[in-house]
Curated annotation (Swiss-Prot):
Keyword Mitochondrion: no
Protein name: Cytochrome P450 3A24
UniProt induction comment: P450 can be induced to high levels in liver and other tissues by various foreign compounds, including drugs, pesticides, and carcinogens.
Organism whose genome encodes this protein: Ovis aries
Membrane topology value: Peripheral membrane protein
Length: 503
């Protein structure tokens, strides 16, 4: 008994009350789904179901889908997530009730200047920024930017040839990460970099700092488990994005903008210039124009949204081609017929390539960019007989939808024919969501697809890809954040002939 402290009765009572209060604080929201009649895995106090993500969010979602069916409830800390897979419910959330109820994405923590980014901004600010940015992503503007991207397609081919000539296997992420970084820094900041050849460039170093993201990161966990800390972090200027990187990039945008405004030469067409033009347009009311902070936030978010997504998808696609030589050959035949003698790709013709489109779409089905997407419920609402309280995050498990055998027969098989002209009209648009859908879908979708297609055409004009001893077969994925390979994808790169176009 000597091991037990000799506290007074009052002290023991206070300790007991404190423990009960701590337990209640860590669990007070955890009875929500039981009240609503929605099943789901049992949450832990404070953590909810977050610790189950250690094996991967995809794996966790697939287990829940098999066990609970089309709808289930989970908790990230005390935050309730209603996970939905029914296409009609998805349509209501992402499209029909987007403006009235499900306008905003869930914000995970203190954002600083990045709260002005189009993918983070809320309600009226989001609508205004989205309206101002939308003309930037029209086919006409993308066509104007195509020569900039084409230039980096040539750099990509040169870099790949250097690696192929070494006779060693090539890390796809190194090659396509450099291409992705070059295109984004060029179109968002007007900066020309060969990032593979200049990895120490401050733009490259700071851009990569933005991209170190893990769902089990201690800082991210702290704001998920203790959301009351977010305002404190904001006051202390501690944000989800590395301050040094954001400061460097925002100062660079400011400097480049000032330089362009002083320069009387005709500026080139890129995202940065188009945003500057929108600020100075007489057609835009001054109170509606992008502020300088908003302009800077968009430039930075383009890096965050575009680098990993493009480079990972291209890496996955080349892995698929290497392990499906029949698909690779058929795609090369289409490319050779469309652009004879390795002619440079053009914007309009690239968009019309049917088999290329099928291969890209099927790659994005098997390896979607994001594991999930979500919307925050702004008010109590009932949808298709389900009551959703205000503050609940409604989540769509994209990976689960894209691998559902009832929607996609033999979903683990790579079949571009699913997206042929004959078949794609039968696909429900609310079960294929690589870029989301509705008013808040990915604003850069067409840019991303154009960017990827150009890279694919340029490399397949000049090279073929084969598995090597370092290639992980079957490929395993890591889903603690974006979907990426568990191990780097290494492939053998073979010159198709001795002539290299654009290099």
């Amino acid at each position: 008994m000597e091991l037990i402290p000799s506290f007074s009765l009052e002290t023991w009572v206070l300790l007991a009350i404190s423990l009960v209060l701590l337990y209640l604080y860590g669990t007070y929201s955890h009875g929500l789904f039981k009240k609503l009649g929605v099943s789901g895995p049992r949450p832990l106090p404070y953590f909810g179901n977050v610790l189950s993500y250690r094996k991967g969010v995809c794996e966790f979602d697939e287990e829940c889908f098999k066990k609970y069916g089309k709808m289930w409830g989970v908790f990230e800390g005390k935050q309730p997530l209603l996970v939905i897979t029914d296409p009609d419910v998805i349509k209501t959330v992402l499209v029909k009730e987007c403006y009235s109820v499900f306008t905003n994405r869930r914000v995970f923590g203190p954002m600083g200047i990045m709260k002005n980014a189009v993918s983070v901004a809320e309600d009226e600010q989001w609508k205004r920024i989205r309206t101002l940015l939308s003309p930037t992503f029209t086919s006409g503007k993308l066509k104007d930017m195509f020569p900039i991207i084409g230039k980096y397609g040539d750099v990509l081919v040169r870099n790949l040839r250097k690696e192929a000539e070494k006779g060693k296997s090539v890390n796809m992420k190194d090659i396509f990460g450099a291409y992705s970084m070059d295109v984004i820094t060029s179109t968002s900041f007007g900066v020309n970099i060969d990032s593979l050849g200049n990895p120490q460039d401050p733009f490259v170093e700071n851009a990569k700092k933005l991209l170190r993201f893990n769902i089990l990161d201690p800082f991210l966990l702290s704001v998920v488990l203790f959301p009351f800390l977010v305002p404190i972090f904001e006051v202390l200027n501690i944000t989800m994005f590395p301050k040094s990187a954001v400061d460097f990039l925002t100062k660079s945008v400011k400097r480049i903008k000032e330089s362009r405004l002083k320069d009387n030469q005709k500026p080139r067409v890129d995202f940065l210039q188009l945003m500057i033009n929108s600020q100075n347009s007489k057609e835009t009311d001054n109170h509606k124009a992008l502020s300088d902070q908003e302009l800077m936030a968009q430039s930075v978010i383009f890096i965050f949204a575009g680098y990993e997504t493009t480079s990972n998808t291209l890496s996955f696609l080349l892995y698929i081609l290497a392990t499906h030589p029949d698909v690779q050959q058929k795609l090369q035949e289409e490319i050779d017929a469309t652009f004879p003698n390795k002619a440079p790709p053009t914007y309009d013709v690239l968009a019309q390539m049917e088999y290329l489109d099928m291969v890209v779409n099927e790659t994005l089905r098997m390896f979607p960019i994001a594991v999930r997407l979500d919307r925050l419920c702004k008010k109590d609402v009932e949808i298709h007989g389900v009551s959703i309280p205000k503050g609940t995050a409604v989540t769509v498990p994209i990976f689960v939808l894209h691998r559902d055998p009832q929607l996609w027969p033999e979903p683990e098989e790579f079949r571009p024919e699913r997206f042929s002209k004959k078949n794609k009209d039968s696909i429900n648009p609310y079960v294929y969501l690589p870029f989301g859908t509705g008013p808040r879908n990915c604003i850069g979708m067409r840019f991303a697809i154009m960017n990827m297609k150009l890279a694919i055409v340029r490399v397949l004009q000049n090279f073929s890809f084969k598995p090597c001893k370092e290639t992980q077969i079957p490929l395993k994925i890591n889903s603690q954040g974006l979907i990426r390979p568990e191990k780097p994808i290494f492939l053998k790169v073979v010159l198709r002939d001795e002539t290299i176009s654009g290099a």
